[in-house]
Amino acid sequence: MHRPIPTRPTRPTRPARLASRAAAAAALLVLLPAVPAAAAETPHLDAVERELRTVSPGLEGRIWERTAGNTLDASTPGGADWLLQTPGCWGDSACAKRPGTERLLSKITENVSRAQQTVDVSTLAPFPNGAFQDALVAGLKTSAARGNKLTVRILVGAAPIYHLGVVPSKYRDELVAKLGDDARNVDLTIASMTTSKTAFSWNHSKILLVDGQSVITGGINSWKDDYLETGHPVADVDLALKGPAAASAGRYLDELWSWTCQNKSNISSVWFASSHNAACTPSMPKAPVAAVPRGDVPVIAVGGLGVGILRNDPASAFRPHLPAAPDTKCVVGLHDNTNADRDYDTVNPEESALRTLISTATRHIEISQQDVNATCPPLPRYDIRVYDALAPKLAAGVKVRIVVSDPANRGAVGSGGYSQITSLAEISDTLRNRLTLLTGDRGTARNTMCSHLQLATFRSSSAPTWADGHPYAQHHKVVAVDDEAFYLGSKNLYPAWLQDFGYVVESPAASRQLTAQLLGPQWQYSRPTASVDYEQGICPAA
């Protein structure tokens, strides 16, 4: 049978072929889902995440969590006022105008006023007072007046004896009175808690969370006497954020509230009060995932449980090398959770996160803290592994800048006690000693330190003190590396066994804003106090 030979089609011209291919490609793009741009490299977050999966794998999604799609919550897209500073009066020792404080208070009211279901407040005792309380109440009234039925949890950490006057039922009554008729739409659950008296452990986190979608967190305590109604306000900083990492803060608070509710009948640990006979609320309703527009900032939320909530992470196979140092212990023989307790490590992943973040630096590290060393006794003098993270960085030529609160603030815990050292030499001597162990030679250690370290006490103006004569007090908890990533939260670098929370953020754009708005002006005014400064050739005697 004869098979017919098909006729060969006419070959289209080159322009026609290109047009046809372009049309086909365009049609295909319409049919396919949008593909996001390749994610930016995140070496710092990746290293922290790996460490947390080793140390505390069973606490992922509860105490720590990595998320993408977050937005730093500025008043304008790309703005820098997601960084909430108090008082924000750089260059003015009289601090007549306090734009940072004003922005913080207005942001508190703004966020709370948008609440539709839930508001979480967490801080160190005493309860928010003065304009802090007014900002919270104003937001609650605005939301409630719109007909929203709100569940509000307020949790403070209470130091034994020191905070005996912090009474939840009294604060509930204050809020109900200030809310007036709007109180009928607000269910208040209020508690103070202490998880371990012998280990000095209580809530120290500072979180304002609204509907699990927006969060303000950092180091700022809501205390009028220290931050507002004074001529020498504490320098401090929070960040504002929207996105999945806000919900991470809610899951962390649920852990603290679960313990609080379980122990609310034990008056030696928990004092509890509520309005409308509301029960203790161990967990809040979860916000819908699609409720917040997605951003582009990757974040690790990371907290710690201190002592008394959970002994260890049963899922962890972590086996750390725990270095020793003879000068970490003082007179009191208190168990050293920071330097000598593997189980403590597994339920306080934030400490591993901070050490790891420091270790990821390749160019420079900025540390802005109240202190790097603790009050000894009763606590260990310092975290050996923090210094042992810094020492090899200095030896490798990484520049390190440390700014701490003026030691003239040394005093009792709480108001007025914003330093725990007597001299910057406590820090530089410790760092030199750890470098000596690393290099094997004291002279080499000194030269290494003085070639790469800057160490100073905080000032916010060119004057040596505030206009009223008081020393500058700094309460930051910031660690920044390479203008690429930073930690901002409530966790100090010195030993303290509290419940704390913060974020590790990897964003070069946000890191540049942090430098421009805080770290740059800080060094401009603090530099004259430097006891070590490789740029000025200042070096302590051998």
Question: Which ranges hold each PLM region?
Answer:
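Bacterial N-terminal signal peptides
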Residues: A23-A34
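Charged, low-complexity intrinsically disordered terminal segments
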Residues: A40-A542
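Sec/Tat signal peptide C-region and signal peptidase I cleavage site
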Residues: V35-A39
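N-terminal secretory signal peptides that target proteins for export/translocation
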Residues: M1-L18
